[in-house]
Amino acid sequence: MKRILVFCAAALALVGCCKTQEQPKGITETLLLNDYRPVNVNNIPQTFVEKAKYPVIDMHSHDYIAAPEEVDAWVEAMDRCGVEQTHIMHCSWIGKPFEEVMAPYAKYGDRFKFWCSLDYTQMLKDGSADECIAYLEKCHEMGAVGVGEMGDKGQGDLYARPTEGYGLHIDDPRLKPVWAKCAELKMPINIHVGEPYWMYLPQDATNDGLPNGAVWHVDTTAADCLGYEGLMVTFENALRENPATIFIACHYLNMNQDLPRLGAMLDKYPNMYIDISARVAEAAQTPRATREFLIKYQDRVLFGTDNGMSAQMY
């Protein structure tokens, strides 16, 4: 009897040990989604478009060159891909005055067009728009065809150079004379309003934009920072209050998640346009709806890249 009890005790101990041993995890439990790189093995027809069927105007780019000679390579890439003209936006993060941005591109004439920033230095001191308008006129005389890229992600136009426009939203009354001057000079305004909607949502397992959202998450807790809807209100105010001025909302107005709403705004405001730059992934989530939207509003939609200057990018 003792032998049986000893044997049973030993067996139970062995089973217990087996249960506590950690089993090796399979690849589905250890592979990070960020590292997942599936290779498509489906034998289906594929189309690679290497050159645009019709000449293309890229309405949203920046001064990406590190040296003047890089402009030559950029033009070669444009020629190879059928890009007739590129519009270069000026922002605070460019780091150079407007006239210095233009200089390296001069030999290519109309292959490049330039948009200027706004100087808010005086406006933020005493509310006057005089110096801002004078700078706008100066840039226009030098060749600026528009204003932008402005950028308001909640705290005002922080893309402006040389003075960032903290607290200056696009519907600020102090800017109204500037928008009137833009209309007079036929200079449209390109503005980056907010960020993609899912960046404002909880960064958890339900967020379908989590990989980017976790990195670029919008901190709306900053002082006087407007949220997504608050920013959309400022943009609509500007459209309504300045009907003679053209406003271009870049990146689909960051409204890819609600194309019916975006379309309704285009229907309501004839002075509103959008560009499609830097939102390929967001548009790809709803390919059929996006296609229908682009066809319906093709006269109000501008092509743009905002993503470098290589042929591969185009």
PLM feature segments, named:
Residues 67-68, 75, 223, 229-237, ...:
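H/E-rich (His + Asp/Glu) clusters that bind or coordinate divalent metals
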Residues 2-8:
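Sec-dependent signal peptide recognition
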Residues 56-61, 85-89, 112-117, 147-149, ...:
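Hydrophobic faces of well-ordered beta-strands that scaffold small-molecule active sites
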Residues 63-71, 89-98, 121-130, 169, ...:
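Acidic-and-aromatic substrate-binding clefts and catalytic sites of carbohydrate-active enzymes
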